[in-house]
């Protein structure tokens, strides 16, 4: 299926309108829509590493379109070099759409699973209270631990982790961000 896509079916993205300040280093959130082919992730990671940057976060998953995946990549870097990376990503053969969401309105979320020690009823009650405040949920229970699932933005997850640290975090798994441009942002761009 992916090999049958023609150039006319690929989305063309207008360059983002933003002021690029030389030397400014900050976190960028880049989304990449790709054909779900072997080696695509490796080529993208190599391109970014080749510019001297580490991928801080990465989420990849299928989209509603058969044979198409979406990547959300977090990378900290200089605006000018990241702009070059975005342009080079657009040229990769299996890349269909690339967007730097850093300076446009967007929604981002991540998920964390946090296994916390709960050796007493008091600890269990307090961990449950914190979980409810953050709208998380307990997804696994053992005699000495609760495993909590929480979703939200980076600040929310970091705040919950800080509150759970005094109980002792036994284990934690955290996804990279998933991000999507806000609909109003897309419509505004189309009207320009």
From Swiss-Prot:
| Enzyme Commission (EC) number | 2.2.1.6
Biological process per Gene Ontology, one example term: L-valine biosynthetic process
Q: Which reaction does it catalyse?
A: 2 pyruvate + H(+) = (2S)-2-acetolactate + CO2
Positions the record marks as coiled coil are: none
Look up the domain of life of the source.
Answer: Bacteria
Residue pairs linked by disulfide bridges in the UniProt entry: none
> So, what pathway does this thing act in?
Amino-acid biosynthesis; L-isoleucine biosynthesis; L-isoleucine from 2-oxobutanoate: step 1/4; Amino-acid biosynthesis; L-valine biosynthesis; L-valine from pyruvate: step 1/4
* Ranges that cross the membrane: none
Under Gene Ontology molecular function, one entry of this record is:
acetolactate synthase regulator activity
Name the keywords, alphabetized: Amino-acid biosynthesis, Branched-chain amino acid biosynthesis, Transferase
Q: Name one Pfam family in it.
A: ALS_ss_C
Q: Name one GO cellular component term.
A: cytosol
Domain spans labelled ACT: 29-103
PANTHER family cross-referenced by the UniProt entry:
ACETOLACTATE SYNTHASE SMALL SUBUNIT, ACETOLACTATE SYNTHASE SMALL SUBUNIT 1, CHLOROPLASTIC
Q: Which family does it belong to?
A: Belongs to the acetolactate synthase small subunit family.
Subunit annotation = Dimer of large and small chains.
Task: Specify the protein name.
Answer: Acetolactate synthase small subunit
Q: Which organism is it from?
A: Aquifex aeolicus (strain VF5)
The primary gene name is ilvH
């Amino acid at each position: 299926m992916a090999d049958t896509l023609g150039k006319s079916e690929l989305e063309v993205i207008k360059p983002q309108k933003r002021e690029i300040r030389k030397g400014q280093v900050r976190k960028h959130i880049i989304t990449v829509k790709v054909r779900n082919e072997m080696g695509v992730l490796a080529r993208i990671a190599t391109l970014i590493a080749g510019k001297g940057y580490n991928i801080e976060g990465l989420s990849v998953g299928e989209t509603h379109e058969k044979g198409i995946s979406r990547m959300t990549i977090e990378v900290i870097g200089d605006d000018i070099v990241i702009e070059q990376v975005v342009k080079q990503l657009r040229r990769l053969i299996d890349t269909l759409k690339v967007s730097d969401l850093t300076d446009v309105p967007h929604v981002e979320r991540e998920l964390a699973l946090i296994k916390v020690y709960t050796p007493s009823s008091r600890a269990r009650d307090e961990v449950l209270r914190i979980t409810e405040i953050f709208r998380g949920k307990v997804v696994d229970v053992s005699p000495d631990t609760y495993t909590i699932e929480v979703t939200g933005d980076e600040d929310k997850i970091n705040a919950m982790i800080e509150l759970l640290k005094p109980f002792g975090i036994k284990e934690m798994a955290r996804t990279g961000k998933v991000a999507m441009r806000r609909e109003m942002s897309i419509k505004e761009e189309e009207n320009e």
